[in-house]
């Protein structure tokens, strides 16, 4: 069984910059029975790859206003893998990539949704989501909420091709003394609910002044900002540092 795993080109598969989808892929790959024949494709300028099976796809026009970065990415992927004869191609978080690769590659396709399908090009409309249900071999969601969002306006009886696979962690053998901390981890934007967190955490910190709140993550675009003496923004941290911080919270 030969498997190609395709990440979004913005998903950095490195120790220094990995976020949720890259970490999910890395963790599940390490326990896969097919890992000897599973290769992960993405785009990054860094070299500290999470696993040795990673293959980097170069993109020349990553911020071009005159050409589609996604189309260039897919074109370069096809060039890289067309002769590999993969049995399965897994695509993470980018339904539009499936639509482009399906035309060029003869493999079974699995699409993973890590975020709200209604916010992604290629799955916003009912027609687009029905097309995915018909043409994909499997659709996997990382939570029931993500699955429910996908089926808004659709008959849930069509869910026989879908499945929920939750993220997982190793159970800690040593329980550390906990501190009064509330942690937000992720992109600090509206789509991740950071605006809701902001409203809730200010009320909590006003009422319980012996607690502190921390935001771990970044966002280059316009976003909510929290102003409170007991809230601290730590920026982007490596995955291991995040886990260490959470273990004490």
Roles of regions detected by a PLM:
Residues 122, 129-161:
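A short, active-site helix/loop in glycosyltransferases that binds the activated sugar's phosphate group
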Residues 7-15, 27-68, 219:
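N-terminal strand-loop element at the rim of the active site
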Residues 117, 145-146, 164-173, 220-221:
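Short beta-strand->alpha-helix junction loop in the catalytic core
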Residues 4-6, 140, 173-192, 198-202, ...:
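Conserved donor-binding/catalytic core segment of Leloir-type glycosyltransferases
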Residues 222-243:
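Nucleotide-activated donor-binding/catalytic signature segment of Leloir-type glycosyltransferases, i.e.
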Residues 91-97, 113:
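Short His-centered aromatic/hydrophobic patch
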Residues 244-249:
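Short alpha-helical donor nucleotide-sugar binding micro-motif in glycosyltransferases
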Residues 185, 198, 211-227:
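Glycosyltransferase donor-sugar binding loop
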């Amino acid at each position: 069984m030969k498997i190609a795993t395709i990440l979004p080109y913005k998903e950095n598969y490195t120790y220094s910059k990995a976020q949720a989808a890259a970490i999910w892929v890395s963790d599940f790959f390490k326990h896969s029975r097919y890992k000897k024949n599973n290769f992960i494709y993405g785009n990054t300028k860094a070299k500290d790859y999470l696993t040795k099976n990673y293959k980097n796809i170069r993109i020349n026009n990553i911020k071009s206003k005159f050409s589609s970065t996604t189309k260039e990415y897919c074109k370069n992927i096809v060039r890289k893998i067309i002769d590999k004869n993969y049995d399965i191609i897994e695509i993470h978080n980018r339904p539009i990539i499936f639509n482009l690769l399906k035309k060029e590659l003869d493999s079974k396709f699995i699409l993973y949704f890590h975020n709200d399908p209604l916010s992604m090009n290629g799955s916003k409309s009912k027609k687009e989501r029905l097309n995915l249900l018909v043409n994909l071999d499997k659709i996997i969601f990382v939570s029931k909420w993500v699955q429910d969002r996908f089926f808004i306006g659709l008959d849930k009886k069509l869910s026989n091709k879908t499945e929920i696979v939750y993220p997982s962690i190793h159970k800690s053998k040593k329980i550390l003394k906990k501190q009064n901390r509330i942690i937000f981890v992720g992109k600090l934007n509206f789509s991740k609910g950071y605006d809701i967190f902001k409203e809730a955490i200010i009320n909590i910190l006003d009422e319980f002044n012996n607690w502190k709140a921390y935001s771990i993550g970044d966002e280059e675009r316009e976003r909510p900002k929290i102003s409170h003496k007991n809230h601290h923004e730590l920026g982007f941290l490596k995955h291991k540092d995040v886990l260490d911080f959470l273990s004490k919270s």
